[in-house]
């Protein structure tokens, strides 16, 4: 299940050049679990674009931010300025519902 519909207090933190997603996720039994997931394990930077299945996007990003409920659909959007091969930075975003889900109170990649 997309994590955002079963999450509370979703946020990111950048620590030691890694971007970590945190939230309280509802388990199948209805209880809540404090969960975290290192987004650099599943998101990379491919010439200034987010790349699913890549790694370490934080190393070539600046101004990383997260909006847990953006727009009318209240989607969790990760935004950053990503460096391309020429050293230029570009504003990019990715909808985390497309790549991260809640499996019984734990974050899991969809691929």
UniProtKB/Swiss-Prot annotation:
Gene Ontology terms, MF aspect: carbohydrate binding
Database matches in InterPro entries: Cyanovirin-N, Cyanovirin-N_sf
UniProt superkingdom: Eukaryota
Gene3D superfamilies cross-referenced by the UniProt entry: Cyanovirin-N
Zinc found in the keyword field: no
Record's keyword terms, sorted: Lectin
Pfam families: CVNH
Family membership: Belongs to the cyanovirin-N family.
Biological function: Mannose-binding lectin.
Protein's name in the database: Cyanovirin-N homolog
């Amino acid at each position: 299940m997309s994590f955002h519909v079963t999450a509370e207090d979703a946020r990111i933190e950048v620590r030691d050049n890694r971007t970590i997603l945190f939230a309280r996720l509802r388990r199948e039994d209805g209880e809540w679990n404090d969960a975290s997931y290192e987004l650099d394990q599943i998101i990379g930077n491919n010439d200034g674009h987010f790349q699913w299945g890549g790694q370490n996007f934080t190393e070539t990003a600046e101004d990383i931010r997260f909006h847990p409920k953006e727009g009318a659909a209240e989607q969790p959007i990760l935004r950053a300025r990503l460096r391309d091969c020429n050293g230029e930075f570009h504003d990019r975003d990715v909808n985390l519902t497309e790549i991260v889900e809640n499996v019984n109170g734990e974050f899991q990649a969809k691929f």
